[in-house]
Amino acid sequence: MNFTEPSPLAQSTVVGFLPELESLTPVPSNETSCENWREVHHLVFHAANVCFAVGLLIPTTLHLHMILLRVMLSIGCTLYVVWATLYRCALDMMIWNSVFLGINILHLSYLLYKKRPVKIEKDLGGVYHRLFEPLRVPPDLFRRLTGQFCVIQTLKRGQVYATEDKTSVDDRLSILLKGRMKVSYRGHFLHNIYPCAFIDSPEFRSTQMHKGEKFQVTIVADDNCRFLCWSRERLTYFLESEPFLYEIFRYLIGKDITNKLYSLNDPTLNDKKVKKLEPQMSLSTQISMLEMRNSITSSSDIEDGLHHFLRGSSSTASLPMSSPQQRASPKMKPIEEGLEDDDEVFVPVSPAHQLP
């Protein structure tokens, strides 16, 4: 058997590596390498972390939650930059915290810009405080609504806003700012329109189902009037992109149509009186509103239905009648507005429930 003897060069190489291998001491994997803890950092470091903790503990229900959070984060990043520069001498920590500080300052500036007081024009202040502010519409959103595609127009006394069977209802939607307008149909006076009320809300609702219609009434300025006028098409596109404002308009227009129905029953009723009488409308008012709705909806022609209601109202108004509060029986239940059918208003009593 042949044996190969190691060369002297290989032996010297192995012997040379032995001292280096002996100097290496492996670290067990189940023990920590932090045997000696370093000293506690400077107070500035702890103050920065306290600011971060306070910012994260701010409740989200607080109105200025995001602003306070960004303020505390900005203060904390500033203290970190000071600590890394003066006490740690760490360039990388200073750079990263400077970047975080810049981001927080930019976001804080944006939040403060959004919270700035928005100035509303004097002519539009009454409309905002009366209609939109109670529904929590922000001033900046109202300014967007009234600043892009609407104009303020004027009408002198006697000038016509819309003529029945001639003026298209597809062009505009308006709110009266100042003055008073008179609405009539075939020469019959219907009701007045007062400030902070929509001029053509029924027509706006009808055009959502049918296009190309004409005004069924004539609207004339009974005084020098100023009104806010939107382009119907552009307003529709804007409301489609703002679901919140879309629901606000649906509510306001529905309420305005209801007030106009009350005014049909009493032409001298203004907006303030309607607001006071809404919780306690008399029985005759509710009956006349149901008659008007049924007359219009049951007729194939809207003009014939409204004309039939006007003739019935004028004939009944000429008869001497006592106060409805005096004639109404205390056992009679009030009629709900949601009932649209006359057959559902008065329900016959079953013989089983009649007294012997």
Swiss-Prot record:
Per the record, residues carrying Phosphoserine are: S295, S318
Protein biosynthesis in keyword set? no
Query: What's a GO cellular component annotated to this UniProt protein?
Result: plasma membrane
**How is it placed in the membrane, per its record?**
Multi-pass membrane protein
The segments labelled Required for interaction with KCNK2 in the record are 136-186
InterPro entries, per the entry: cNMP-bd_dom_sf, POPDC1-3, POPDC1-3_dom, RmlC-like_jellyroll
Stretches of Low complexity bias are at 313-323
| Expression across tissues | Strongly expressed in heart and skeletal muscle. Weakly expressed in brain, spleen, liver, kidney and lung.
The residues on the Extracellular side of the membrane are 1-48, 92
Q: Where is this region: Disordered?
A: 313-356
Protein name in the entry: Popeye domain-containing protein 1
What are the GO BP annotations of this UniProt entry?
Answer: cell migration involved in heart development; epithelial cell-cell adhesion; heart development; hematopoietic progenitor cell differentiation; positive regulation of locomotion; positive regulation of receptor recycling; regulation of cell shape; regulation of endocytic recycling
The UniProt entry, under PANTHER family, shows: BLOOD VESSEL EPICARDIAL SUBSTANCE (PTHR12101:SF17), POPEYE DOMAIN CONTAINING PROTEIN (PTHR12101)
Q: Which gene encodes it?
A: Popdc1
Keyword field contains Phosphoprotein = yes
Q: Transmembrane residues, as ranges?
A: 49-69, 71-91, 93-113
